[in-house]
Amino acid sequence: MGEKAILDLHLVSDSTCETVVSVARAAVEHFKSLEVNEFVWSLVGSKSHVDRIISSIDRKRNNLIMYTVLDDDLREYLKKKAEAYNIRCIPILSHIIREISCYLSVAKDPNAHPHRLSDEYFNRIEAINYTIAHDDGQSLWDIDGADIIIVGVSRTSKSPTSIYLAYRGYKVVNIPFVHSITLPIDSAALADKLVVGLTIDIDRLIQIRRNRLISMKNQSNCNYISYEQVEQEISEVNRICMKNQWPLIDVTQKSIEETAATIIQFFNRKNNKIGGDAFC
């Protein structure tokens, strides 16, 4: 196999760079033979800032600029500077905005400033704080504030899934199922909440738990990786979810993002929002 092509990818935004980073990373995932050096330039608000970016680029290398810049003058300046230095410059949102505008015959809002602190931003911060405070069954006294409740046995990715959802703006409580201990929630009182169970292949869970014990230098906890106990835990969670008609997601072959996306689909359906079908 030949050497990988090397690309210096410069991601530029007058906002947080979150959008351009997400799109760029999704795009380069399609090129496994490509080695990418990523440079993130966020909160670019002046022509002098653009000048510094352009001057820092090594023109002997393969360079590509991907950007989201709302300000018309600054955007044009970036494009002209890149063109002058023979650097390819790709807008992320311009085509989409143009298509929406043409399709609906409406002009884009000239006063839109997505990088300003918005209600959505503060709601996201609130969701993150709430979710952290309610990790691993903590602070269940105000569970009514949750949008989503996740239950599952130990090491089924409840916490990272919860944090990912919180970053999307959902307040999440995750509750561990402990063998022979009743779940500390009243299922009848949660009828209006989305409660989701996470399950996993038994052998896979034992492997994850064994690796966890090794990393903690605690290999004496035999029950934690006992096939019989793990099987009982999984069976009990499955039974509880079936009894309460809670959706159950098998995370054995799922990434955190895929699990979260499935949960969001369940949330949208429960709240009569468009979200498509969820496949577990």
Curated annotation (Swiss-Prot):
GO terms for molecular function: ADP binding; ATP binding; phosphotransferase activity, phosphate group as acceptor; protein serine/threonine kinase activity. Keywords: Kinase, Nucleotide-binding, Serine/threonine-protein kinase, Transferase. It comes from the Bacteria. ADP binds at G152, V153, S154, R155, T156, S157, K158, S159. Pfam families: Kinase-PPPase (PF03618). InterPro entries: Kinase-pyrophosphorylase, PPDK_reg. Its EC number is 2.7.11.32, 2.7.4.27. It catalyses: N(tele)-phospho-L-histidyl/L-threonyl-[pyruvate, phosphate dikinase] + ADP = N(tele)-phospho-L-histidyl/O-phospho-L-threonyl-[pyruvate, phosphate dikinase] + AMP + H(+); N(tele)-phospho-L-histidyl/O-phospho-L-threonyl-[pyruvate, phosphate dikinase] + phosphate + H(+) = N(tele)-phospho-L-histidyl/L-threonyl-[pyruvate, phosphate dikinase] + diphosphate. Belongs to the pyruvate, phosphate/water dikinase regulatory protein family. PDRP subfamily. Bifunctional serine/threonine kinase and phosphorylase involved in the regulation of the pyruvate, phosphate dikinase (PPDK) by catalyzing its phosphorylation/dephosphorylation. HAMAP family: PDRP (MF_00921). This is Putative pyruvate, phosphate dikinase regulatory protein.
